[in-house]
Every structure is written in structure tokens, then in C-alpha cells.
Swiss-Prot record:
This is Hydrogenase maturation factor HypA. One of its GO terms (molecular function) is nickel cation binding. PANTHER family: HYDROGENASE MATURATION FACTOR HYPA. Keywords: Metal-binding, Nickel, Zinc. GO terms for biological process: protein maturation; protein modification process. Belongs to the HypA/HybF family. InterPro entries: Hydgase_Ni_incorp_HypA/HybF_CS (IPR020538), HypA/HybF (IPR000688). The lineage of its organism: Bacteria, Bacillati, Cyanobacteriota, Cyanophyceae, Nostocales. Coiled coil: none annotated. The gene is hypA. The keyword Zinc applies. Ni(2+) binds at H2.
Length: 113
């Protein structure tokens, strides 16, 4: 389960960014072609965030669908797997979306001094 290591890195990156401030919400974008299971990341997040400034934060995960462009005819096609075939018969596709893993938003508590 590589999601544990990925989630540990996400917690470390967000903790560094928050600089000790309490994190309320995180929005991740995970591509459907990335081989990362959103449910596993959610499960690991609850464990990895314990005792950190992220504990209790809401983790929102937005899944990004797979999309590719055919090198032969230029058509864009939806992908459910990291490979596919275009309507023109070509298998030469460039993936446009679906492989990403991004920390898109981080919401931290404001500290008034």
C-alpha cells in the first residue's frame, strides 16, 4: 500500500506550509489514472495526521478523470485505464489529465496577534 508513504509526504508538506498553524481543510486532486486509491489516502490521513497541526482537518479529495489526445487525428478521448484506443484506430495517445496528485488548497486557522 504505497498510499501510506504518499499520505505521510502530504502531511509533511502541509505541516511545513502551515508553520505550526492549525490546518482546517485540505483539498487534494488525484487523477483516476494515478494508481492512487482515494479511500486509502483518506484512511491513512486520519492515522498520519494524529498529533500534528493537521489532526481533525477535513481532507477533501477531488478525482480527476483520465483524458488523452490522439497523436494521429487530434481527438480527445476519455480514459478509464492508462492506455486506450482512439476512434480512428490509433493507440498513440498523449495523456492530458488523470495522472496528477496535487495539494490544491490548504485552509489554516488565522492567528490574531
Amino acid at each position: 500500500m504505497h498510499e501510506l508513504g504518499i499520505t505521510q509526504n502530504i502531511v509533511a508538506i502541509v505541516s511545513e506550509y502551515a508553520q505550526g498553524s492549525k490546518v482546517n481543510r485540505i483539498l487534494l486532486e488525484i487523477g483516476k489514472l494515478s494508481a492512487i486509491m482515494p479511500d486509502a489516502v483518506q484512511f491513512c490521513f486520519d492515522i498520519c495526521s494524529k498529533g500534528t497541526s493537521l489532526e481533525g482537518a477535513v481532507l477533501e479529495i477531488r478525482e480527476i478523470p483520465g483524458l488523452a489526445k490522439c497523436r494521429q487525428c487530434g481527438a480527445e478521448i476519455a480514459l478509464e485505464k492508462p492506455f486506450g484506443i482512439c476512434g480512428c484506430g490509433s493507440v498513440h495517445l498523449d495523456v492530458i489529465t488523470g495522472e496528477e496528485l496535487k495539494i490544491k488548497e490548504i485552509e489554516v486557522e488565522e492567528v490574531c496577534v
